[in-house]
């Protein structure tokens, strides 16, 4: 992500070097932070991250967790116990452990939990049909499923939740046309990341942790905010069900 310059430096100078910060993980699950000067093409520093913390999970790790779970013998036996044999209809969703990691996973190892859903066809909405009571625990560092947690067979819902045309018994009549016109053009302007509207000016950027960030927000040239971002928004599931009690989704920053 872009390493934003200090507020004081940005106000004093216009021609600044551009810096980026990389938070990554290597193939041995070691986290690291690196800072790079893009203007001079220099690596300024690289530091190891404590094993008490870690970078965001990568897509490669997500796909690896799905592959390991799908190929695990105990997981397949748990599906068979539920009468499920066609693995092509299984959707696996890996989740962060929410700070609750199995004791047989070494401290500092990258770990995920996987929950599953059963589709009745390739285009089905799998989230309407959860496979309850089944959780796979994956050690990404060791490349294996360490445990399949099975809380007993619960019948998979039969109803689907598809909203496509083919998934409906009948369709409603077409709504009446809505026409929104601006004969004199729009009332705002966008130039690169600078947005201007009715005396307001702001710059917008996307931060990999915070999401949308607003910079140098002003009204009629009067400063309002130097920077505004959403630091966090956690959605705890608050359920005692073994499938959900450990979930605390960072919807605003994850």
PLM feature segments, named:
Residues 1-85:
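Post-signal-peptide, soluble extracytosolic/periplasmic N-terminal scaffold domains
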Residues 52-56, 60-254:
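Beta-strand/loop-rich accessory regions of lumenal/periplasmic or secreted enzymes
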